[in-house]
Amino acid sequence: MKLNTKIACGTLCVLIFGGAYQHGAAQNNLLFSQSKVYAAANKENPQQTRAYIAQTYSQRDKLAPLAPGSLKLTGYFENDIQNSLTHWNKGVLPYARIADFFRNGRAQFALGEMWGKAVLSGAMLYRYTHDPELKTILQATVKDILTTVRENGSISCVPVSEQPDGKGGDLWERKYVLLALTTYYTYVEAAPEVLKAMIGEANSILDQIGDAPKHDIIEQGWSWNGIESSSVLEPIMRLYEITGDKRYLDFSKYVIDRGGCRNANIFTQALQNVPPHEMASGYPKAYEMNSVFNGLVEYYRMTGEEKWKTCFENYFRNIKQNEITIVGNGGADEPYYPKWAGEAWDNTAKEQANPKIKRMMETCIGVSWMKFCTYVLRTTADVSAADYIEKYIYNGLLGAMKPGGDGFSYVNLLNGDKVTNQGWGWDFDGLPVTCCNLNGPTGLAYIPYMAVMQSGNGPVVNLYNSFTAKALTAKKRNVEMVLKTEFPRSNKAELELTKLKSEKFSLTLRIPSWSKNTKVSVNGEPVKDVVAGKYLTLERKWNKGDKISITFDMKCRVIDAPIGSNPESANFQAVEYGPIVLARDENTDANYNAPVKFVTDDAGTMNITPVKPLLAGTRMEFEVPTANGKIRMSDYSSVNCWQGKKICTWIPRVR
């Protein structure tokens, strides 16, 4: 295979050869704008530029991420990202020992996923931080893993004679190796030996999996329906985007044609709007299913087959409606799938207050859902995808993270034992490494990826965490912006354009669905037609120093629990403040799960008072009025249950 690396910076002659460029990115205004900037900034590494552009832009995308290094968060999320980066990716993560699974074999199924997940999150975090210490760590572990390449080109935990090791999860493990290496190659170092290893890994899969006499993909995997193996679709499509080798596109079509799992076709089911918990023939494993649909989005981006856009949009809508809880994650054990330990779709949106639930909301589910929402947002500009990301990151994602930054909870309850390390994984001399410990940092890395994005007509603001950002105008000129805010502690934000040449272009703001009466002004002049749950596009001649002021409608809302299979769910209510879910904390309140009657107005809202938190590390705490006096509630994410205390998010009513 010959790679064309000639790049003329500032033109569309980035020369991504072959099918991927022809089908995906050609003659796209959005591609042109970002590729021009990225190529100019990275002209010393044309291979990496080509890989970045190939994977990042498609003519079908409505939005694109800003170029790496173009956004810097400050405050709320930045502290958490740095905490995790310092204490996990640059801290306790045992890179050498998880790489040894490929050298010495594994003691249980799927352990080979660990290396791929570690490098995937690290590479995505490097995309944001350009941290030199992190780069050195990643370079060392990639160099190490390349010494494990087997004679058929595979990086696998089992010898060639035992591949594909179906019940051992060999294909799933190799999927994660490919995801890690494509991400590393794109954002960290586009070394030729890495590209060679990616191609070798992919080609070894193509040699083994396919139509008879090869092994059938849906017969691979540890689960009885093999759904996890079809998630190889995403990295194979990424490699197609990088290389243009049509064999990878053909293989991806084969994966889709096989339906995603045994005894069901999850793509047909999504097209038919089958509820997610009824998909996949009795094993609707949520994390793995999300991973497969991430690959389907990539396939659509390159082929433009509208059928598949309808398919993933149906899946997206049905997950929103049927599975996502108030903290932005989903999946549970009761009532449908107790044997899957809280890791399956379970009609969770309706069942979330069911007192019989013992395990729910695996962190892997939440992160894969967030990633899928990001893909949907990029491809369709569906503003609800950003709403659901916001819901998850402020509540479920941060709520799963250990206070010390050195890991994430496996599953996450709304009432009772909020967090646990109990689940699939391996203990390294007292350090529990689980799938969720490894996936959590990837979720953090996707926050800056989508916080501010680029349309063909100007920047798009999706999140209101304070930031500095560099984007492009409609004429492809640089514009620099600063968002000043204490959100969500405050309901006010101010966006200032700090550097630009005067020009007419569009600046687009997401108006959150929870903010029913948002006020927006430009240089003091009120803006009309501001609608909750929509994008607000401000098209005008912008000048340096222009300011956009935003006031959110941060009413505190009391919501009744949805009622699913268990009528006892009707006995609970929850409290939301803007995007933040509040909870009672046994660490500070011995009566944390006692029934209360909230004092609300006719619209179900109430006046709460911010107070100084009783515990260090609590982000937000409020006095909340009840019929028997005020109680304290804090944000769900801050409730620390790692030392055995409990949480109450669905509050029992006074009967």
Where do the protein language model's features map onto the residues?
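Low-complexity, Ser/Thr/Pro/Gly-enriched N-terminal "stalk/linker" regions
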Residues: 28-114, 131-158
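Well-ordered alpha-helical scaffold segments within catalytic/enzyme domains
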Residues: 69-71, 75-77, 117-132, 176-191, ...
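Long, well-ordered core segments of solenoidal/helical folds
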Residues: 71-105, 137-154, 196-215, 250-270, ...
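C-terminal beta-rich recognition modules with glycine/proline-rich loops and embedded aromatic residues
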Residues: 30-32, 37-38, 42-46, 252, ...
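Bacterial Sec-dependent N-terminal signal peptides
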Residues: 1-29
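Catalytic-core region of carbohydrate-active enzymes that cleave or remodel glycosidic bonds
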Residues: 298-322, 354-406
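Extended ligand-binding groove/face enriched in aromatic
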Residues: 104-108, 125-266
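Solvent-exposed loop and edge beta-strand segments that line ligand/cofactor-binding
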Residues: 48-49, 100-115, 158-177, 210-229, ...
